[in-house]
């Protein structure tokens, strides 16, 4: 096995991209930390190392590190919070309050472990709260959500500008925040604004994440949301093109979480373009993928769309 010193690995890639230490570490750690890393005198936390590698477009699966007890607790709590968040979104009303309480208890435990200068962790907590809403169960307003998400991305990218997304480097968690921002604009009815953000975001992923297996789900996710925004703007052919890119990425990397959404949007676009055979086939494919992946909400929405477009009624 060929072994490469981590500091050299990062420095070589940084210089290939023409980046200064300050540009690479902005919002994650201090330049002196990068200098010490490259010289072998210090190793940052695994969370920070992963973020730096992702910003450089490098895979993190070749890097291994021992975790401190605190880092182990933080990683475990993050996974539990993500799991609770997913359960909360799909739970029936009677269960949601109990899950919400459980999640905020875990958030409080995580906040107690967090260092004040751990911007990545604070960012994670902010975007999680946007999904969850307040502790009393009341959702944040759309304007409040936007304010929270912009604050979250600017924790690690202080000069972030929605008009010039490609002027900075991003780790995968930062990509998720920007994706949330674009989705929020779509929810506000500002679909053209959303498409402008998704267009930049997809281009960034295609350029920087070619070598990162861990990012396999990001391109289909962004392509799915981008295609939906284009559909809402009535750019049906462009929406089909973007959705097809997402579909191909799902097949290539074996990541199918966004596939039913992509096929759903493609079915609607085909309907608008008068392609009855193609549209019906895609509706059926999307419906049974929703069923297979336990997506009841998506399946219900698709049933309505299929019935409205073609009078299709799914028996199973």
Place the predicted regions along the sequence by residue.
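Helix-turn-helix repeat elements of alpha-solenoid scaffolds
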Residues: 88-111, 138-160, 191-204, 234-244, ...
């Amino acid at each position: 096995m060929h072994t490469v010193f981590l500091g050299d690995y990062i420095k070589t890639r940084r210089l290939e991209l023409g980046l200064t230490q300050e540009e690479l570490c902005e919002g994650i750690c201090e330049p002196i930390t990068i200098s010490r890393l490259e010289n072998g005198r210090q190793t940052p936390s695994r969370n920070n190392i992963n973020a730096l590698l992702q910003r450089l477009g490098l895979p993190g699966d070749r890097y291994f590190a021992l975790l401190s007890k605190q880092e182990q607790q933080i990683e475990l709590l993050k996974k539990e919070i993500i799991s609770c968040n997913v359960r909360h979104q799909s739970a029936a009303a009677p269960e949601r309050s109990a899950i919400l309480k459980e999640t905020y208890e875990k958030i409080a435990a995580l906040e107690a472990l967090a260092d004040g200068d751990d911007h990545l962790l604070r960012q994670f907590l902010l975007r999680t709260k946007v999904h969850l809403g307040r502790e009393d169960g009341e959702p944040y307003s759309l304007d409040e959500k936007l304010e929270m998400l912009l604050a979250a991305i600017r924790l690690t990218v202080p000069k972030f500008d929605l008009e010039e997304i490609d002027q900075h480097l991003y780790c995968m968690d930062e990509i998720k925040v920007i994706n949330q921002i674009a989705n929020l604009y779509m929810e506000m009815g500002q679909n053209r604004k959303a498409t402008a953000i998704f267009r930049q975001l997809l281009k960034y992923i295609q350029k920087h994440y070619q070598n990162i297996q861990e990012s396999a789900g990001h391109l289909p996710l962004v392509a799915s949301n981008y295609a939906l925004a284009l559909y809402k703007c009535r750019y049906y052919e462009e929406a089909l093109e973007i959705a097809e890119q997402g579909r191909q990425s799902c097949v290539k990397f074996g990541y199918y979480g966004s596939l039913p959404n992509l096929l759903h949007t493609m079915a609607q676009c085909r309907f608008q373009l008068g392609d009855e055979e193609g549209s019906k086939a895609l509706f059926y494919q999307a419906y049974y993928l929703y069923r297979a992946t336990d997506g009841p909400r998506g399946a219900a929405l698709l049933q309505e769309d299929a019935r409205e477009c073609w009078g299709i009624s799914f028996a199973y």
